[in-house]
Amino acid sequence: MSTPSFSPRTATVERTTAETDVSVALTLDGDGSYDVDTGVGFFDHMLSLFAKHGALDLEVRCDGDLEVDDHHTVEDVAIGLGRALDDALGDKAHIARYGHAYVPMDDALARAVVDLSGRSYCHLEASFERNQVGGLSTELVEHVWRSVADHARCNLHLTVLRGHNAHHKIEALFKAAARALRTAVRRRADHAEVASTKGTLA
């Protein structure tokens, strides 16, 4: 049996509305490099460490209506990220499909489980002691991951198991999601062409 030749998995998504102008460029088989500017400092930090811990290359630009609030910017970037993940994965041949990770961050401990099934679902269990961290409304953390799951067409179960510092809890969550995804997207020649008895993960 011949060994499959793996081509680079990249995607660029651009999205323009009356509220935001977003560009997301993604390389799944990267080295964790990033260049992120959304105008929301803490969100930039989370996306940057998502790239680093996910071993993917990520460029994000967003010019949003931050004079209103951070909602439109954060939502539209998450939509772009989800679409880029879906586009880059292509037919999902030879991927592991599933991934999970636990990540501690001082007082916080988070768990992420992902299935690149082609079906959208997100369940997040977390509470935060502050309404905002570094310009990011904490109520949007769940919205970020729901938007990613919807547009990447994947199944995400995310849990903050313990902690009391909102910054640490959110950071542990993003790192856990990144590391779970890193496992799920990994390609190996000895993996089934498509990891499903249906023959497709579309």
From Swiss-Prot:
Q: What is its EC number?
A: 4.2.1.19
- Tell me which Pfam families the record gives: IGPD
Q: In which pathway does it act?
A: Amino-acid biosynthesis; L-histidine biosynthesis; L-histidine from 5-phospho-alpha-D-ribose 1-diphosphate: step 6/9
One GO MF annotation is: imidazoleglycerol-phosphate dehydratase activity
State where it is primarily located: cytoplasm
Q: Which InterPro entries match?
A: IGPD_sf (IPR038494), ImidazoleglycerolP_deHydtase (IPR000807), ImidazoleglycerP_deHydtase_CS (IPR020565), Ribosomal_Su5_D2-typ_SF (IPR020568)
- The keyword Amino-acid biosynthesis is assigned to this record: yes
Q: Does the keyword Lyase apply?
A: yes
Gene Ontology biological process: L-histidine biosynthetic process
In which domain of life is the source organism classified? Answer: Bacteria
Q: What class of enzyme is it?
A: lyase
Query: What's a single GO CC term here?
Result: cytoplasm
Task: State its location(s).
Answer: Cytoplasm
Catalysed reactions listed for this entry? D-erythro-1-(imidazol-4-yl)glycerol 3-phosphate = 3-(imidazol-4-yl)-2-oxopropyl phosphate + H2O
Alphabetized, the UniProt keywords read: Amino-acid biosynthesis, Cytoplasm, Histidine biosynthesis, Lyase
**What protein family does this chain belong to?**
Belongs to the imidazoleglycerol-phosphate dehydratase family.
NCBIfam families, from UniProt?
PRK00951.2-1, PRK00951.2-4, PRK00951.2-6
| Cited HAMAP family | HisB (MF_00076)
Would you tell me the protein name for this molecule? Imidazoleglycerol-phosphate dehydratase
| Gene field | hisB
